Amino acid sequence: MLRKRVEIGPVESGLWNAVETDGAAHLTLIDPASQDPERAVQMARSAADAGTTALMVGGSVGATGSALDRTVRAIKDSVDLPVILFPSSAAGLCDNADAVFFMSLLNSRSTSYLIENQALGAPIVSRYGIEAIPMGYIVVEPGGTVGWVGDAKLVPRRKPDIAAAYALAGRYLGMRLIYLEAGSGAESPVPTSMVSAVRDAIGDTLLVVGGGIRDAEAARKLVSAGADLIVTGTGVEESGDVFRFVKDIVTAIHV
């Protein structure tokens, strides 16, 4: 008897559709620990108006509990875009999001970030009925807070083959998205040579790139190198005009 194939949920399908339609897509990352829900809603509205495809909510430190729940709830009540959780641990889950990037930090030295938090979180995700999107997460130098918190063996910036090997392992493990992360607030993004190497290794798996993306030109170069989804968080928070910042990136990456 043939077993039923795994079905892709509506949020993940929406990401695929956006990439297929426009060549690439933008995701806005909002950290509940960085601002109150009211400010988060303002950022989300501006990003939505500018053409971001979905809103990620999470962070390396403090994105848990009531701050997370209130932020997700406020955004859901105000913005008609999918809200995807971006948890650093099982504590970064709540029941009012649309989906979760269910990820393993592939180059972590700690089993906590490779599989233990995932085992703790899986029953919660199932009980909440949140769409789980399987993702391999790879942290590249300098790594920022997430590299330290996640005890990552950082991929050297001049070693694209190492990133490609981790990414290919993620693909073979069944992860449908691979995320290259330079770290929140990094001075520069993941090198384009590394993005290209990973793109070649993982075929049609969705490739996400985040960290250190501070302007539209940087985003455009990453997409030209092979990125499908561009994530900005710190850049959005620090921009004086969220709409303009996101709009410039969205315009630059659409082909």
Swiss-Prot record:
Cofactors demanded by this protein: Mg(2+)
Pathway(s) where this gene product acts: Membrane lipid metabolism; glycerophospholipid metabolism
Binding site for Mg(2+): D31, S60
Subcellular location: Cytoplasm
GO MF: magnesium ion binding; phosphoglycerol geranylgeranyltransferase activity
EC number: 2.5.1.41
Keywords of this entry: Cytoplasm, Lipid biosynthesis, Lipid metabolism, Magnesium, Metal-binding, Phospholipid biosynthesis, Phospholipid metabolism, Transferase
Any one biological process term the GO annotation gives: glycerophospholipid biosynthetic process
Cellular compartments per GO CC: cytoplasm
Family membership: Belongs to the GGGP/HepGP synthase family. Group II subfamily.
Protein purpose: Prenyltransferase that catalyzes the transfer of the geranylgeranyl moiety of geranylgeranyl diphosphate (GGPP) to the C3 hydroxyl of sn-glycerol-1-phosphate (G1P). This reaction is the first ether-bond-formation step in the biosynthesis of archaeal membrane lipids.
The protein's name in its UniProt record: Geranylgeranylglyceryl phosphate synthase
The species this protein was found in: Methanothrix thermoacetophila (strain DSM 6194 / JCM 14653 / NBRC 101360 / PT)
